[in-house]
Design a protein with these regions (language model features):
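Conserved phosphate-binding elements of NTP-dependent enzyme cores
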Residues: 1-950
Length: 950
């Protein structure tokens, strides 16, 4: 390898890496693979990327570095040949409700510019195209005011702009004006006016003060002309005691008199007060308390806890009980009356209050009783007021459980002011454009009819928008709309959006480190993704991709296999080179699967199920097109389809939420369908997603699975603990007593970074052990409680082998391929796939009924094919016990093992939402309309060939 064209790593020891030496070619597509926990991410992200980032930070000035903090040097002897590094992972999804696909990709900025430069304004009321106004037309409009109306003619020289505005104020003085209105307050220009520099101000010069009469027309025309000259064609008529009138020399509707100022990009921004809808401030939605969530089951009475809202749960002797009794006395119900039997008036008073009417309240306490009269606010107004006013995040979260998002009645979810929405290009406004899919937007831009002049002005903008939309399409995201909220994107989607954005930036000589970009991607779209990564490489960049996808490996220039096992059994370079090189290495598990020496078998027979089924009738949420789907029970079911075809909507939004509401009493609102039939055959539903098992470093696999409670009890039963009088609570790091008080049992201290995510550093007192010295003196088999938390699951399985209660829970973690994680590993450091498997292990450890429905969303995320093999066996075990497992999956090794496939499509977005194929994998593979079938057929054929050789 050319010494000038390589990245050389010497002595990498980060996490479980064992003094790794490695050479990587530059300007190539490199795939790092290996078992989950083998050390791939430690090498790619925590060593190579971290050192590239640290070196960049050190090149900045000390002033800039004070805001960024000190980056720790990775545990590595030396890395040479490193370029500036950019990480594209899945943990940086925006949760800001104002972020959309359009804003994240910056395409929306170009659209705002496009609508500002070549947009055609219309009247928001009549839809008529708006043209320029003359001074005479403005005068005629003002003269329509009633006789004797007093008004001021103002010239708005500054509109909502930061700064002291000294220059504009001096110019007004020199021009001979006497008064000025600043932010609604009048000032004399002869006095000194000091404005706050960092606040936005509006400055309007008072040109004239007039009263409507027969003789004022000439003077009014002169004053308007003066104001227009001062304020670049704008004038404000401030009617005393009435609504102000604004005129523009540019645009106004002749029929309704609505003026539109000169079009600017900020008019089309929903994050700017000039463009945002005034009612919802640009969010497009409101959070409102949902009566159906406050009282989810009207068959129950108040005493039976029919009301499920923060502060309003029924309890004897509480203020809520006193209120309910008073309402019952006034409106004729008791605490034992089912809510469904309440009169309309009674239910309205309970939920929305008694208005001005005071009702008799009977107060009882240990000091006696008394009567007083008071108005009742109502449960819903009370909750909404508390939600607005509270500073407690916990209270907000509690109230949010009974709230739902409702479309803004003013803008109908479109986020912008009526005047902004009345501007069109090619006949559609900016919100309509953003509601189209990326594929439809590309078609629209290519066919939009605009004038020759507008085409010349808009050509460079069209070019930028088309390029960026093309990049989104090339990474398999053609089904997304630009108006879609960034928070609703999956990890894989947000990562591919950032990948498309990087291609748009066209940087060269950069090191990109990617974390499983193929997650959530159908095999059809995976080919596009690989082509995109090659395109980034061909620009002159190096790509290091942590990936398990076989197609990506076969297309890579160079593969690094890290292993051979996970955790302490990993951390070595097992093989490096081409696919052929990897296949030759006998100890490479990746090579064994790539060469066909090992493979995931196709079952000889498919399960028949129990003959019963769940049926979703006429599902029409999002892009689902009134489909009716059967989910046969007692089978392993795979729901497949290209990205955006409606899989998550059908399974998570409709089926899971409906079952959870009916069987578990969940309060989430299910997606729209006519009915879900067959629920009587199921007694429990368990959804296992990739959300974190906890949002702070205090949460860990041991606490989540409940095994830590058993371990604490075990420690409290030791001779040493009994002598000292220590109970299980002594060994908790969440309560005072046994924990280190310096870090309050966290083992780490949180340092708030004002411009960046918080940084965690080990506690100086306990050195990260979480407990005080006395607690750590108690040992079980020569290990302290802190030592146990530092053990991997695999080590703990051996250590606690003789304690069945603990061993059983640990064994399930081992079964799902998590033998390498530590018991006390912070939840914040677990990937989405790892968190999902911790939840799966937690459910496996419970006693099941044989009538449970398990729903998993892409459980193979982050899994090597060997781990997938193990996971499939775990899922088989659940189904063999009589349960039903429904999996949303793209991984063909899982799909080929399914008993039943439901394939949605045929495309994503508006081109999806229908059932393309159902049946066994063999039946779907023969369906010519199914993209899944097309990729499944060769996989089944290869598996049959390998099994026959075996």
């Amino acid at each position: 390898m050319d010494p000038n064209n390589r990245i050389v790593i010497k002595g990498a020891r980060e996490h479980n890496l064992k003094n790794v030496d490695l050479e990587l070619p530059r300007d190539k597509l490199i795939v790092m693979t290996g078992l989950s926990g083998s050390g791939k991410s430690s090498l790619a992200f925590d060593t190579i990327y971290a050192d590239g980032q640290r070196r960049y930070m050190e090149s900045l000035s000390s002033y800039a570095r004070q805001f960024l903090g000190q980056m720790e040097k990775p545990d590595v002897d030396e890395i040479t040949g490193l370029s500036p590094a950019i990480s594209i992972d899945q943990k940086t999804t925006s949760h800001n409700p104002r972020s959309t696909v359009g804003t994240v990709t910056e395409i929306y900025d170009y659209l705002r510019l496009m609508y500002a430069r070549i947009g055609v304004p219309h009247c928001p009321i009549c839809g008529r195209e708006i043209t320029q106004q003359t001074v005479d037309e403005m005068v005629d409009e003002v003269m329509k005011l009633p006789e004797r109306t007093r008004f001021q003619v103002l010239a708005p020289v500054v509109r909502a702009r930061k700064g002291t505005q000294a220059k504009e104020l001096d110019a007004a003085r020199r021009a001979g004006f006497a008064r000025v209105r600043v932010d609604g307050n009048m000032y004399d220009l002869s006095e000194e006016i000091n404005l706050e520099k960092n606040i936005k101000h509006t400055v309007e010069i008072v040109v004239d003060r007039l009263v409507i009469n027969d003789t004022v027309r000439g003077r009014l025309a002169d004053s308007i002309e003066t104001a227009l000259a001062q304020a670049n064609g704008l004038v404000v008529i401030d009617v005393i005691g009435g609504e102000p009138m604004m005129f523009s020399q540019s645009y106004a509707c002749p029929e309704h008199g609505i003026s539109v100022e000169e079009l600017t990009p900020r008019m089309f921004s929903f994050n700017n007060p000039f463009g945002a809808c005034e009612k919802c401030t640009g969010l497009g939605t409101f959070m409102k308390v949902d009566p159906a969530r406050v009282i989810p089951d009207k068959r129950k009475s108040i005493r039976e806890s029919a009301i499920k809202a923060s502060g309003w749960y029924y309890a004897e002797g509480s203020i809520s009980e006193m209120t309910y009794k008073a309402l019952g006395k006034r409106y004729g119900f008791t605490l034992d009356t089912p809510v469904k039997d309440f009169s309309k008036e009674a239910l309205h008073a309970l939920l929305y209050g008694t208005g001005d009417e005071r009702i008799e309240m009977q107060r009882e306490s240990m000091f006696g009783s008394g009567t007083y009269f008071n108005q009742f606010e109502g449960i819903i107004p009370n909750l909404e007021r508390r939600f607005r006013e509270t500073s407690s995040e916990w209270v907000k979260e509690e109230i949010a459980l009974v709230m739902s998002s409702e479309e803004c009645p003013a803008c109908h979810g479109r986020r912008l002011k009526p005047t902004s929405l009345a501007v069109t290009v090619g006949g559609i406004n900016i919100a309509d454009f953003c509601d189209k899919s990326v594929n439809e937007e590309l078609d629209f831009i290519n066919t939009a009819k605009v004038s020759t002049r507008d085409e010349m002005i808009g050509a460079p903008i069209f070019k930028e928008v088309k390029e960026r939309l093309g990049f989104l399409k090339s990474v398999g995201l053609g089904y997304l709309t630009l108006s879609r909220g960034a928070a609703s994107l999956s990890g894989g989607e947000s990562q591919r959006i950032r990948l498309a954005t990087q291609i748009g930036s066209a940087l060269t000589g950069v090191l990109y480190v990617l974390d499983e970009p193929s997650i959530g991607l159908h095999q059809r779209d995976n080919d596009k993704l690989i082509a995109t990564m090659k395109r980034l490489r061909d620009l002159g960049n190096t790509l290091i991709v942590v990936e398990h996808d076989e197609d990506t490996m076969r297309q890579a220039d160079y593969i690094v296999d890290v292993g051979p096992g996970a955790g302490v059994h990993g951390g070595e370079i097992v093989a490096a080179g081409s696919v052929a090189d990897i296949c030759k290495v006998k100890r490479s598990i990746t090579g064994a699967y790539l060469s066909g020496r090992k493979f995931v078998e196709v079952p000889e027979t498919r399960r028949e199920g129990n003959g019963k089924a769940l049926r979703v009738v006429k599902a029409h949420e999002n892009n689902l097109q009134d489909i009716t789907v059967d989910f046969p029970l007692g089978k392993l079911i795979c729901v497949t389809g290209v990205s955006g075809s409606g899989k998550s909507t059908l399974v998570n939004e409709i089926l899971y939420k409906t079952l959870a509401a009916a069987l578990n009493g969940a309060r989430s609102r299910p997606g729209q369908c006519e009915a879900v039939e067959g629920m009587e055959w199921v007694d429990k539903v368990i959804g296992i997603d990739q959300s974190p098992i906890g949002r702070t470093p205090r949460s860990n696999p041991a606490t989540y699975t409940g095994v830590f409670g058993d371990i604490r009890t075990l420690f409290s039963n030791t001779q040493d603990a009994k002598m000292r009088g220590y109970g299980p609570g002594r060994f908790s790091f969440n309560v005072k007593g046994g924990r280190c008080e310096a870090c309050e049992g966290g083992g780490i201290l949180t340092i708030e970074m004002h411009f960046l995510p918080d940084i965690y550093v080990p506690c100086d007192v306990c050195k990260g052990k979480r407990y005080n010295r006395e607690t750590l003196e108690v040992k079980y088999k020569d290990k302290t409680i802190s030592d146990v938390l530092d053990m991997t699951v695999e080590e703990a399985c051996v250590f606690f082998a003789n304690i069945p209660k603990i061993a059983r829970k640990l064994q399930t973690l081992q079964e799902v391929g998590l033998g390498y994680i530590q018991l006390g590993q912070a939840a914040t450091t677990l990937s989405g796939g790892e968190a999902q498997r911790v939840k799966l292990a937690n459910e496996l450890a419970r006693r099941d009924t044989g009538q449970t429905v398990y729903i998993l969303d892409e459980p193979t995320t982050g899994l090597h094919v060997a781990d997938v093999h193990r996971l499939v066996k775990v899922l088989d075990k659940l189904v063999d016990a009589g349960n039903t497992v429904i999996v949303i999956e793209h991984n063909l090794d899982v799909i080929k093992r399914a008993d039943y496939i439901i394939d949605l499509g045929p495309e994503g977005g508006s081109g999806g939402g229908t059932i393309v194929a159902t049946g066994t994998p063999e039946e779907v593979a023969q369906n010519p309309h199914s993209f899944t079938g097309q990729y499944l057929r060769p996989v089944l054929e290869r598996a049959a060939e390998l099994q026959s050789q075996k």
